[in-house]
Design a protein with these regions (language model features):
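Phosphopantetheine-dependent thiolation modules in NRPS/PKS and related acyl-activating systems
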Residues: 2-48, 53-83
Length: 83
């Protein structure tokens, strides 16, 4: 299924679920690095690798540092979809 604006939330949720090893029903717009125990350094690394693999890109260090919550991940995924 191609990624577009209609299924961006679905694809973002799949990335989060796999990287943070959480169930899809645990993913809400309130998801944040501070309120998700599995979002440790390894979870963050899995998330970055997942984004880079899915979109065949390399995130800049500033982008990696900016990934702190659902909205920031969604914004990055949205940007890659619309490039």
């Amino acid at each position: 299924m191609p990624i577009d604006s209609k299924n961006i939330h679905h694809e973002t949720n799949k990335l989060l679920s796999a990287a943070l090893e959480i169930e899809s029903d645990e993913i809400t717009e309130d998801l944040h690095i501070d309120n998700t125990p599995s979002w440790d350094s390894f979870g963050h690394l899995r998330l970055v690798v997942g984004i880079e693999s899915k979109f065949n890109v390399q995130l800049k260090p500033t982008e990696i540092e900016s990934i702190l919550d659902y909205q920031s991940i969604y914004a990055i995924v949205d940007r890659f979809i619309n490039e």
